[in-house]
Amino acid sequence: MQNKIANQSNIRRSNPVATLKKNAMLIILVLVYIFFTIMTKGRMFKPTSFASLINQNAYVYILGCGMLMCMLTGGNIDLSCGAFVCLLGALGGMMMVIWKWGTALSLVAMLAIGVVYGCGLGALIAYVMVPPWIATLAGYLAFRGLGTSILGVSSTNSISFKDSPDFLSIFSGTLFKTPEGQMNMPCMIVGVVAAALVVLLVFKNRATRLRKGYEVDALEMDAAKSVLGAAVILLVMYKLAMAGGIPTVLVWVAVVVLLYAFITSKTTIGRHFYVVGGNIEAARLSGVNTKRIMFLAYLNMAFLTSIAAMTTISRYTAANADAGKNFEMDASSACVVGGVSASGGAGSVLGMVIGATLIGVINLGMFQINLDANYQRVVKGFVLLAAVVFDILSKKQQKL
């Protein structure tokens, strides 16, 4: 009886205003999607648009996980990741196409280069105490120049991967491929299993928190979250089933997102990132190795950039000098729009995913209504500014 009373006291009462603020970006995402669906006369809701959204924005989700870890340490970002994608793409093209190293060895080499760069960058920032924006700006300038120079050996300033079908199938292929417009049952089965897992995890997490005496949301709120999450998964998988199957890049994105969601929420090292970003001096005094956390943030970012480079050049079917352009802006925008604090110490992988999806929907929607590229940049700039202002105002209200 006492346990039951204790559990009831740990249940938060539903506050409509607080709930609205907490889910503001999710609500905006839905409204923006509806807006562009109307403006494009339904094209945004077609199965091919769902597939395009995933394929074209895979790099944002992957880099966003890395940028999240950097921003958690105190609002730091990596300005070099886009240029590093260009350099890695050029080197990957040389290894796979020019030097004939084969797909497996070339991919391992690209990952190794990413790790080496990450160690060097992390050491400069964490131990030599070079400011992150200076260290990564140097990389931004150097890598773009190196990548363009390497690609200059080709008469077309690009290296095609059309003769590397194994590589293309790994990152830009389709699982359970069927003709477009035909129901893909394996795809739907995956969707049903994933939706069921979401519902199971929501209530398992609720039971665990109650057992440990932590606060939880009202039962109807958790039920609503699980139903909404399951519905979104089923809708996306249905659209992909009608579009021809599951893009292989979605598997890579799912693995990265789920892994980093686990790291940031369930591990000690993940919690240390939040502690360092919240108050670095307090973190140091409490025994957290702050230099190690900063080192790991940039090592991790470089490693994920290697994976993003693979998905990018595979989608382009070529390595070219434009690969990675403005990727650092897209990744940091996804984090900020998704609620990651610009000053560090707060944010989540789920929020980043919502932010990345919102940026992707805006990009795809503006493309489908043929909005001029310059105006597209203006819109994205205002979206980013609005997200930062929202973050600042929310923090001020919390202090009152």
What function would you assign to each model-found segment?
Residues 33-38, 43-99, 123-133, 282, ...:
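Single transmembrane alpha-helix segments in multi-pass membrane proteins
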Residues 143-264, 399:
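Transmembrane helix-bundle core of multi-pass membrane transporters
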Residues 42-52, 152, 237-250, 261-265, ...:
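Inter-helical junctions in multi-pass inner-membrane proteins, predominant
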Residues 202-216, 258-298:
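Membrane-helix/interface signature in polytopic inner-membrane proteins
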Residues 298-311, 315-378:
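Transmembrane alpha-helical segments in multi-pass inner-membrane proteins
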Residues 100-141, 354:
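Alpha-helical transmembrane segments within multi-pass membrane transporters and channels
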Residues 56, 132, 161-162, 182-192, ...:
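Loop-to-transmembrane alpha-helix initiation sites
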Residues 1-34, 197-227, 289-292, 366-400:
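Cytosolic-side transmembrane-helix boundaries in multi-pass membrane proteins
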